[in-house]
Amino acid sequence: MQKITFGDLTNQGICPTCYNREHGYCLTGDETDKTLYENDLFKCVLIGEPRAEGHTVIISQQHYKDMMEIPDELCKEVYVFAKKAMNAIKEVYGAESVYLCTMCDGPMNHFHVQLIPRYSFERRGSKNFVKERKPYVEDKAKVAELRKILN
């Protein structure tokens, strides 16, 4: 049996984020170890293949195509939380800065906000949004510290 991919679902007009959630995280695997915060509106998780250590995503629980579709209350909640998370990531991981990015611009999107740390040894600028992805390396102490700050 061939494994279904995010691209396969997108090509079929199916939101991969919603499909993944509805089918027991079959695409990304169990995210429990990477989940930093969750409520009825959104979930905040460390990325499985990060562009930098501490790369995090905030994903709306309900399906919205992009920021233009989300209710004002959700927008407020996500961005207030994002500010808190950015400061926490900077503190816990020692990042010089944390970029906030939302680029929902494909045939099948699900609103999300990415928080991508930039470290002092890295160049500034938008190229950080497309840095090569790396394998996720769990750091239980840092995850615990982030959870403590964010919850």
Label for each model-derived stretch:
Residues M1-N151:
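HIT superfamily nucleotide-processing domains
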